[in-house]
Amino acid sequence: MDRQQAKRRAAELRELLNRYGYEYYVLDRPSVPDAEYDRLMQELIAIEKQYPELKTSDSPTQRIGGPPLEAFRKVTHRVPMMSLANAFNEGDLRDFDRRVRQEVGEAAYVCELKIDGLAVSVRYEDGYFVQGATRGDGTTGEDITENLKTIRSLPLRLNEPVSLEARGEAFMPKASFLRLNEERQARGEELFANPRNAAAGSLRQLDPKVAASRQLDLFVYGLANAEELGIESHSAALSYLQSLGFKVNPERRRCATIDEVIAFVNEWKEKRPQLPYEIDGIVIKVDSFAQQRQLGATAKSPRWAIAYKFPAEEVVTTLIGIEVNVGRTGAVTPTAILEPVRVAGTTVQRATLHNEDFIREKDIRIGDAVIIKKAGDIIPEVVGVVVDRRDGDEVPFTMPTHCPECESELVRLDGEVALRCLNPKCPAQLRERLIHFASRSAMNIEGLGEKVVTQLFNAGLVHDVADLYQLTKEQLVGLERMGEKSAANLLAAIEASKQNSLERLLFGLGIRYVGAKAAQLLAEHFETMERLEAATKDELMAVPEIGEKMADSITTYFSQPEAVELLNELRTYGVNMAYKGRKRTAETPASSVLAGKTVVLTGKLASMSRNEAKEQIERLGGRVTGSVSRSTDIVIAGEDAGSKLDKAQQLGIEIWDETRFLQEISREEQ
């Protein structure tokens, strides 16, 4: 066909394919078979290949994925994407309603399912999709336009030539998640923990073709500039978005009272497992925009909305065995082996049993029906036994008397609940020490994870951490899935680790009771490994937060010939043994806003790791703790901050975003 014919046919195909795509991906009512859709798509691809100038921004071929990007650009949100305060029970919801009515009188609410995905912003100009971005810190996100184009339920052109900015949740349906993990397992790749992580990881791929292959979906749940468009309520905004061609979740309800809201919440607590996607709660918003304006917002969240979070999901499965593992300090830990079961979006086959006393107290037996939940929706644990299901075939479990790895006798030290293997040459302990030494919190050797360490250990290439610094490229390329480039990268990472500051090495050595914070304090105080090795118990206890038990452990470690030999080897290989940080002085903390403050970190910081942030806080005289309480002074919230941020808001604790934190660091360094 000539160019004019091609132009007409391309326009026809775009109209057909966009309509068929809307019917399939948004309405879920396809009017043509998949084969016909594919045939028309191939015809359009062929025309656009022959006549590239005929390609338009709303062409369905743009969803296939363009060339890889070098990096994501930063995007400043015109209207901040605020997080929501949380409710965990009916009382919290009634308190929210009481606050709303005290301020604005009677109010209607809109209840929507809280999709467990990634919050995004999508911007249109004259009806055409021009930019999409992640939420980021609420003010600044990342430009993921090309990846969002691959989501077929997101319109590239609206039904009206309107300019707007909509907010939505990109997610991975359960079926897509299962299929993706099956494919990754077949290729020997690491599995995604849950659909939310899979969706977030897919949208942060620099290659849009990867995102296109992941079969993501998107529900739009809000309009940033609704009032500019003359829309007066949230429910009207959702209807308008739907009329423009957006996919809006039909499972929503306008409620006149808080009792109706609670009924909706309870309804979806029961119906949640039936959905083809994961939800983790219900979002409740005041419907009237006028009332929303009257209610206003705090620094982080609107006062006119709240997110009800479902309680941690509990499921019942069968305990088919108990496996005993040996950690790097010799502690022997029992782990439940379970019939695979879905819990909070992931398939669980293993769960912690803590120790022998826990098993005895719960009377947990092999063959029992056990109750599983995820602590914090992350770590699977056995919380109880369904005794009524016992049929007499269950077998009580007895902890072994000897190490499952080296056959050494296990002992229980005074005051401890764990059994321990005291053999310093135990293969399991050596392997776990290597994994710990290379970990991100310690020497941070990129590419040296558990699988590679196990291969190195099993091949006899390493027996202790000093052996890592003798590895050669020839040795590494002989390992499974280790090519020349990977070997070169790993050797470069090992070489780079030699320059780490003393606190990382000290933590990496795995001295009992010496965590990352204690390592930081010791390194800062003694400045060199030589001074630390020579320190007496009293000198160690003079360091803030170093108690008698830790001091005893440190002096015992440095008195062992094996430890002395290891440190001498590391020195020979050029591993740094000095503190590189800025030594704290009396003046330093006094000048800082963080001096003497108790600080909690939550969420992901774009500019530094969690440990680096912790180091900066401690350098400025602050103290980092892991949980929010009334004694917390400041919470520093990064991207995807969770329950800690919510609790801080409820307690009225000062909250910093990453920009505020960086400003304080910069001010102190001037």
From Swiss-Prot:
Its EC number is 6.5.1.2. The active site is at residue 114. One of its GO terms (molecular function) is DNA binding. It is an enzyme of class 6 (ligase). PROSITE patterns: BRCT, DNA_LIGASE_N1, DNA_LIGASE_N2. It catalyses: NAD(+) + (deoxyribonucleotide)n-3'-hydroxyl + 5'-phospho-(deoxyribonucleotide)m = (deoxyribonucleotide)n+m + AMP + beta-nicotinamide D-nucleotide. Its cofactor is Mg(2+); Mn(2+). GO terms for biological process: DNA repair; DNA replication. GO terms for cellular component: cytosol. Keywords: DNA damage, DNA repair, DNA replication, Ligase, Magnesium, Manganese, Metal-binding, NAD, Zinc. Zn(2+) binds at residues 403, 406, 421, 426. Residues 589-670 form the BRCT domain. NAD(+) binds at residues 34-38, 83-84, 112, 135, 169, 285, 309. Gene3D superfamilies: 5' to 3' exonuclease, C-terminal subdomain, 6.20.10.30, BRCT domain, DNA ligase/mRNA capping enzyme, Helix hairpin bin, Nucleic acid-binding proteins. InterPro entries: BRCT_dom (IPR001357), BRCT_dom_sf (IPR036420), DisA/LigA_HHH (IPR041663), DNA_ligase (IPR001679), DNA_ligase_AS (IPR018239), DNA_ligase_CS (IPR033136), DNAligase_adenylation (IPR013839), DNAligase_N (IPR013840). It comes from the Bacteria. DNA ligase that catalyzes the formation of phosphodiester linkages between 5'-phosphoryl and 3'-hydroxyl groups in double-stranded DNA using NAD as a coenzyme and as the energy source for the reaction. It is essential for DNA replication and repair of damaged DNA. PANTHER family: CHROMOSOME TRANSMISSION FIDELITY FACTOR 18 (PTHR23389), DNA LIGASE (PTHR23389:SF9). Belongs to the NAD-dependent DNA ligase family. LigA subfamily. This is DNA ligase. It comes from Geobacillus thermodenitrificans (strain NG80-2).
